[in-house]
Design a protein with these regions (language model features):
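Residue-identity detector for glycine
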Residues: 3-6
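Conserved PLP-enzyme active-site core in the AAT-like
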Residues: 12-14, 18-311, 316-326, 331-346, ...
């Protein structure tokens, strides 16, 4: 067979023994969570059927539970948050329609260009504060209808914001953005991969953050510890259209109850423990602030993400590699930052262990002049 010509891409999914070693403290992401024992049992015992025919009882039960708990008319299980976001684009927009979005939004930065390659939308970047688009900037970006312009269609929010260091879009800010969108007849989608963190940080029920949007994605693989899956939620009419788009992009599933079973357990056991992860992140930030070479303002940590400036120690890629060799796995954010994320399976002992190892690495790097 002939090969496909074009650029090569690094393999990111190859098993790395340094990451999976029992002694490693993996703070790379909250996607590193593993299914709980109750999830594993639920997967084994779940009643199953063919979800493509709407006959998997566990999927049907989970979607009903999720819609009720999240305060929406309907919910649909999909394979990933990226797929849920893509489906939302396909339902809300037609090719060339205009999407108003922050430059660092996950859908722009980390979803392989699907918004252009598959959905064919026209992104218009709107000024933001820590990733959250500003209402006045959105107002200024929306143009009067004209044959020279794409059709304005969708406003995209992300809460919490990944590249905004896990920052929270507070309720009054979100409502102001929603009001501008409504004024111009635009739909609003919320990338709520970590919306449970956003709600917990504000002392709100998650329903309040989903109440003013037309659709939202909620990821199951982060703080909720599921092995895969996400929810797309919205009105019954929206989800009816979304089921067709899910099939279109290859997301139709058969005995998907094994995924839904984990989601049911997550909703029963884990929805109310999110603040534990935030407290762990604050302990981590406080400890790092006292180590020479790690620059961080602990007050900047709003949820479970800790972004640290390591420029004083060298390039972030080199610092991340040194930490990995010491058994602390972090995410590299070149050229100066690393990211650490707390989650269900990061214990207090792990936080203390990570701080000790990181202090040793910092001391070693300070003693070794950069080449």
């Amino acid at each position: 067979m002939r090969g496909i010509e074009g650029p090569s891409f690094p393999i990111l999914t190859r098993r790395d023994p340094d990451v999976t070693a029992p002694t490693a403290i993996n703070l790379r992401s909250d996607t590193q969570t593993l299914p709980t024992e109750r999830m594993r049992q639920a997967m084994a015992e779940a009643p199953l059927g063919d979800d493509t025919y709407g006959e998997d009882p566990t999927v049907l039960r989970f979607e009903a539970i999720a819609a009720e708990r999240l305060g929406t008319e309907a919910a649909m299980l999909v394979l990933s948050g990226t797929m849920a976001n893509l489906i939302a684009l396909l339902v809300h927009c037609r090719p060339a329609d205009e999407l108003f979005v922050d430059a660092g939004a996950h859908v722009v930065y980390y979803e392989s260009g699907g918004l252009g390659a598959v959905a064919g939308v026209t992104p218009t970047v709107v000024a933001s504060d820590r990733g959250h688009i500003l209402p006045d900037a959105l107002q200024a970006a929306i143009r009067r209808p004209n044959i020279h312009y794409p059709r304005a269609r969708l406003v995209w929010l992300e809460n919490t914001h990944n590249r905004g260091a896990g920052s929270v879009m507070h309720m009054d800010h979100q409502r102001a953005v929603e009001a501008v969108a409504r004024e111009h007849g635009l739909a609003v989608h919320l990338d709520g991969a970590r919306v449970l963190n956003a709600a917990a940080a504000q002392g709100l029920d998650v329903r309040e953050l989903l109440d003013g949007v037309d659709s939202a994605m909620v990821d199951l693989t982060k703080g909720l510890s599921c092995p895969l899956g996400a929810l797309l939620v919205g009105s019954s009419a929206f989800i009816e259209q979304a089921r067709f788009r899910r099939r279109l992009v290859g997301g139709g599933m058969r005995q998907a109850g094994v995924i839904a079973a984990c989601g049911i357990v997550a909703f029963e056991d884990l929805l109310d423990r999110t603040l534990d992860d935030h407290r762990s992140a604050h302990r981590l930030a406080d400890g790092l602030a006292s180590i020479d070479g790690f620059e961080i303002d602990p007050a900047s940590v709003e949820t479970n993400m800790v972004y640290v400036d390591v420029g004083a120690l060298g390039r972030s890629t080199d610092v991340a590699a040194a930490l990995k060799a010491a058994g602390v796995i972090v995410s590299d954010r070149p050229p100066r930052q690393i990211r650490l994320v707390t989650h269900l399976q990061i214990t207090d002992e792990m936080i203390e262990g990570a701080l000790g190892r990181m202090a040793e690495v910092a001391a070693s790097l300070r003693a070794t002049p950069a080449v």
